[in-house]
Every structure is written in C-alpha cells, then in structure tokens.
C-alpha cells in the first residue's frame, strides 16, 4: 500500500502484478486471482477496504457496486463556510493495530493530520459558570461508568439487577448513588445531576439514540468512549477515502448502481442484480450494506431469504442516527463566543409554555467552534429527536438555536447564521441511520451471527461493516477491519484449497 501511495502514476494492474510478483507462485492460486469474480455491494469504508485488499492481492475481477453517486459511505466531508465539516465520522483513534483507520491515515502521504487539542467546555447553569473542579470530578466518575464500572460486581451479588435493564437505568442509578455520597448541599446536588444529564446526552449523541434502548452489554463488551486526543484531518477525512480508490478504475468502482437483488445460491455461480437492469455474476459477494438498509430490505433483497438466525440478528441489533449540525456566520464568532459551551437547566428549558416542536433544543449537549475555523459552529445534540430535527425547516431550526445561543452568552445581538449544514442519515434511503448499537433485545452473539459467511463449500455471501465486529463495534475502525477480514477470508479459501487440494 505504501508503494501505491508513493507511485501515483502507476496504474492499478501494474501495481497488482508487482505486489504478487515476488510471492511463491502456485498455478491454482494464480488461476483464482485471474478468474474469480467478486462483487462488493457498497462503496463505504468496508467495501472500499475489502476491494482494495483483494486487488492488492491480485484478485483483478473485483467490482464495487455503489447505489449513490459518491463513494465513502458515512465518511462525508463538505466544504462549508471557511472550513471543512464532517457529516459522518470525524475522529481517528490513535491505534497501531493492523488494519486500523490510524494505520491507513498514517500511510496516506502528504496529508495534514492534527491531534485534537484539549478544550474544556464551560458548563452554564442559570447564567453562571459551574465550578470546573466539580465538572472534572464528575467527568472522571462518568468515564468509569462508561467502562462498565461495578456492573460485573452487581451481577455477581445479584443486587438491584433492574438498574441493568438498559444503559440509562444503570447511569441514573449509579449517578444518584455518587451524588448522594459526594455532594451534601442541595445546590451542589442539583448542579451535579445536571452535569451528569449532559454527559448522558453526550453518550447518546455518539450512538444516536435514547439510552433506554441500549443494552448494558454494549458498555461491557464494546465500550463507548470518546478518545481524549484523537486525530483529525483539517481538510477532510474523505482524503483518506480518495487514497483508497486511487488505483481503482471505473470498471472496478461503479457508482449509481443501486442493488435490487442478491442471488447467493445455488452454487457455483451467484449474481447481483441492479435496479437499472444490469446483472453481475459472482463467485463471492461481499455485502457491506448499512444495518438500517438490511433492517428494511433484507427480506426482499436476498434470494433465497437469509437464514433465520441472521435475519434475527439484523432485527435485534439497534441502529441509531448521530446528528451533525453546523452553522456558518458572516463575521468571526470569536466576538461573542469565547469557548465551548454546555447549557444546563433553565437555559435549555426557560419556559414551561414552550411549543412541543421547540423541545429538541433541550437535547443540545455542546456548542463549539470548529477547529481551524473562525466562522463555523458545531452543535452537538443528544437524545432521540434526530429524525424530527432532520425534518425541521431551516428557518425554525435557526431561530431556535439562535435563541439558545443568546441565552447562553446573555447577548440578544448574537446574529443569525448565514448558512446551515446538517446530516440526514436517518432519512436517506441508502443509509436509514448512522451507527449500530446493542439494543435491549440483542447480545454479542448477534454481531457474530451477522458476520458469519454463508455458503456450503465456499464463502459465497460474506458480510462486512461496523455492525459485524465486536472489536471497535460501530466505529470506522470496525468498518475498515471488517472489510479486510472478509477479503482475506476469500484469499485464504483459495490458498487453503491450493495447498490441501
């Protein structure tokens, strides 16, 4: 891959020949590389990673079919105001593991990468600042809860198992216990409770759902915690995606190809049919469709219908919708915003007479300036109002968020934004959501069932995506590594067949 990054003028086929030229030759493996037809459904990070790994290893008859007119999936960078904004994934965990997103980013040459700088938000309650020492203490305690602190102990002793019904019950029970033992004054207890509530909403904003829907197993098997010092790409994470496809030609990466049917049996030849009437025969099919699409269309998309255990896994797993909102202003925002803000209490709900459609502002977690920008704000939203916010008219959303900003900084002259940019993952037919989570009716076994390949003699239908890996479940690391995992499964099949006959 490093060779490919350095020699951008080489075409894909020359590179592929070079990559396998020094490996031990086997006629059967060479024939497989030349003749095996592999169709990858979806050009998100799992699909691109799978195809790149197959092409790198000489499997030249690999094609990606992407329904939309763009590749990258939920890595989606938009130029907005004076900066680049991410509508999907933004942060890259610093992780030296093989096949991680960090490894891919590190190997992408000539790309500016920066570490997120510490930015302690100011918590605002009734127009006054919360003591930073209290905030730091509660933040530390909450991070322990996010790691499943005392969950195993509770299970062993059998005490208050009702609080383990879902993540929100667990958070509320443990935070109430902490507040009762750590803070004596009613004023401090109220402030602590509101800080905890803000952190609960932040946790929900990562998954894109109400925490009442999330299984406690999610935080014990797949901890959800934002990195303190992750990497980001100021010019957009989609630069990394561009690097992935630099050696693919138009025949190998085809956009505007929504798939209508996946015929995965009988052996040996399978096929993928597109809505435009085109048909692609395949020896192996790697399905990287988002979980939201599988939930809605798996029953009609696959022929024959998928086995019951896989259909149940698709049904049981939760699929949330993390929302991104960006606001662009004509003049520098530093004139009235001096740092990131986290509004609490009456700032979020100043009047009981608020109209119901304005309630979404109560779910605002943080308002912050986008790094490297002087004109763009990002609004972080928690809770379960994502679909409603996506459908809210621009003028209503701008009026409501401006009202909140004016209350936060006690300045009625805060201007209205010039432009608004927001994600629409839940209402996009090709995604129908943004991130998987463990629902209260599923377990880790559902992830394993979803990831299991189908096929009697060979892995004919394979599944990749961020919902198919417990390691990094729901993250871009899981998306990338799962694509490579399934590509390697195909490669290993032919290597073993050539070796053992």
From Swiss-Prot:
Top-level lineage group: Eukaryota
Chief place where the protein resides: cytoplasm
TM ranges: none
Xref: Gene3D superfamilies: 3.90.660.10, FAD/NAD(P)-binding domain
Record's subcellular location: Cytoplasm
UniProt KW keywords: Cytoplasm
Pfam families linked to this entry: Amino_oxidase (PF01593)
A molecular function (GO) term: polyamine oxidase activity
GO CC entries: cytoplasm
Described function: Has a non-vital function.
PANTHER family for the chain: AMINE OXIDASE DOMAIN-CONTAINING PROTEIN-RELATED (PTHR10742:SF398), FLAVIN MONOAMINE OXIDASE (PTHR10742)
Protein name: Protein anon-37Cs
């Amino acid at each position: 891959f490093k060779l490919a990054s350095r020699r951008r003028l080489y075409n894909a086929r020359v590179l592929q020949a070079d990559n396998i030229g020094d490996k031990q030759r086997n006629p059967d493996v060479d024939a497989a590389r030349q003749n095996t037809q592999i169709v990858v459904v979806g050009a998100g990070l799992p699909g691109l990673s799978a195809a790149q790994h197959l092409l790198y290893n000489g499997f030249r008859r690999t094609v990606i079919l992407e329904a939309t007119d763009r590749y990258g999936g939920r890595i989606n960078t938009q130029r907005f105001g004076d900066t680049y904004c991410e509508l999907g994934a933004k942060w890259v965990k610093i992780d030296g593991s093989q096949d991680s997103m960090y490894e891919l980013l590190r190997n992408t040459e000539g790309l500016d990468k920066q570490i997120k700088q510490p930015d302690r938000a100011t918590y605002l309650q009734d127009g006054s600042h919360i003591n930073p020492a209290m905030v730091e203490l509660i933040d530390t305690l909450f991070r322990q809860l996010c790691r499943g602190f005392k969950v195993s102990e509770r299970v062993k002793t059998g005490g208050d198992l009702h609080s383990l019904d879902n993540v929100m019950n667990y958070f509320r029970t443990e935070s109430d216990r902490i507040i009762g033992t750590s803070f004596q004054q009613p004023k401090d207890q109220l402030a602590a409770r509101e800080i905890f509530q803000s952190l609960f909403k932040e946790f929900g904003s990562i998954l894109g759902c109400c925490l009442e829907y999330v299984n406690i197993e999610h935080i014990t098997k797949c901890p959800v915690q934002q990195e303190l010092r992750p990497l980001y790409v100021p010019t957009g994470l989609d630069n990394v995606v561009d690097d992935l496809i630099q050696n693919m030609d138009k025949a190998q990466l085809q956009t505007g190809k929504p798939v209508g049917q996946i015929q995965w049996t009988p052996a040996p030849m399978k096929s993928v049919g597109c809505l435009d009437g085109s048909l692609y025969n395949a020896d192996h099919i790697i399905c990287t469709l988002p979980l939201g699409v599988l939930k809605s269309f798996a029953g009609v998309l696959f022929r024959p219908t998928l086995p019951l255990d896989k259909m149940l896994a698709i049904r049981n797993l939760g699929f949330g919708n993390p929302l991104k909102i960006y606001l662009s202003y004509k003049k520098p925002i530093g004139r009235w915003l001096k740092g990131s803000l986290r509004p609490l209490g009456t700032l979020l709900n100043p009047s009981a007479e608020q109209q119901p459609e304005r309630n979404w502002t109560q779910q605002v977690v943080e308002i912050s300036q986008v790094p490297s920008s002087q004109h763009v704000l990002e609004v972080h939203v928690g809770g379960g109002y994502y679909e409603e916010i996506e459908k809210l008219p621009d003028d209503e959303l701008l009026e409501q968020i401006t009202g909140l900003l004016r209350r936060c900084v006690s300045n009625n002259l805060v201007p209205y934004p010039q432009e608004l940019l927001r994600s629409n993952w839940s209402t996009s037919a090709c995604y129908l959501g943004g991130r998987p989570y463990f629902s209260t009716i599923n377990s880790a076994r559902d992830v394993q069932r979803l990831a299991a390949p189908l096929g009697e003699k060979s892995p004919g239908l394979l599944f990749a995506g961020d919902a198919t890996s417990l390691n990094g479940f729901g993250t871009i690391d899981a998306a990338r590594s799962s694509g490579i995992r399934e590509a390697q499964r195909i490669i290993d099949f032919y290597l073993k067949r050539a070796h053992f006959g």
